[in-house]
Amino acid sequence: MNVTEFRSGLRRWLDGNDLSPGPDHSLDGQVAQLARVRRALYEADWMRYGWPAEVGGLGGPAVLRAVLGEEVATRGLAEPGIYSMIEVLAPTMISYARPELAAEMVPLLLGGREQWCQGFSEPGSGSDLASLTTRAVPRDGDWVVTGQKVWTSLAQYAARCVLLTRTAPGHDGITAFFVDMDAPGITVRPLRTMHGVDEFAEVFFDDVVVPADRMLGRPGDGWRLAMDLLPHERSTCFWHRVAHLYTRLDRLLTELAEPDDPGEDLALGAAYLALHTVRCRSHGTQRRLAAGARLGPETSVDKVLLAGAEQQLFDTARDLLPGVLELTDTPWREEYLYSRAATIYGGTAEIQRNIIARRLLDLGRD
């Protein structure tokens, strides 16, 4: 099935199957809606395209997943921030888990039966991921994990966690596990953010026993896994977010009176151009994936462009809708506040620019 056939068939199916969100816009409601949408799309096979048959997929290029995400976002069927983890964690499981484990678990994620989380950042190890201290030690054929993670998205809803631990010194001493979040010794404490949604959490591991067959890859493969995962976190998982931001630009145009100030036209044009640039860059990433390329440091360009475009769009809304953010409780206010983190989550803008300078432009470390 080519992209045109897929998109037209998907649109016909969505037109005939109402998956619109209900009245509950709380985080609980958003997570339940995401599960509902994924389950319906999986049962109708749309969620299975672009994934390998070994994990219940129907094959085809990864761009089909991007098309699906765009349609979900354009119709407002699922909150974009929580939809994104599929494109981060499923490829990681396919690449690093035992084939039997991936075949068992990935359909649970794609089919909306489970939510997963990613346990990377720690209180003292955010951008400096290699300094993480959560420790895993072997004991009686299993591994015992002790430590703390923070900024773990949706941990309070997650059934599983892709977890980085330290098993030896240095980069080669980082090992990844696929951990059941209901295991004894795990405590989850949600964190309230300034936009009023407790989607992040800190997670404590107190002598948590993890079976040896839940290791992802081999001992010491955790750093390589992270380097393979993070490019997805900085590119493919944002395909649908670009479409979501276009809907917000459309809403801004609808709410504005007919512009009579050339400066307004310039601001709107600049916001559109920033989004168009991200979309063009994203299409290039999709083509590289379709050609079998492995994503790498070039995805930092995707992340920088997207973060800049998102903040520019909501800055434009603030400037052209005076008082809407400051004096009223509207979606504009919540999304503006959320956009402030766009240059932080998934690796700060400064880190991304350092990666671009050192690994793409070969400018050295100074």
Outline where the language-model segments fall:
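A short, Trp-centered hydrophobic/proline-enriched beta-strand micro-motif
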Residues: 112-120
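C-terminal helix-coil-helix/basic helical segment that borders enzyme active sites and/or dimer interfaces
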Residues: 22-28, 276-330
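Internal helix-loop-helix
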Residues: 43-107, 111-112, 154-160, 275, ...
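Glycine-rich phosphate/cofactor-binding loops in nucleotide/flavin-utilizing enzymes
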Residues: 63, 67-68, 227, 321-366
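A structural signal for short hydrophobic beta-strand segments in well-ordered beta-sheet cores
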Residues: 134-137
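A short core secondary-structure module
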Residues: 142, 146-188
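Glycine-rich beta->alpha junctions and the first turn(s) of the following alpha-helix
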Residues: 186-277, 342
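Amphipathic, small/basic residue-rich leader segments at the start of a protein or domain
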Residues: 1-82, 104, 108, 269, ...
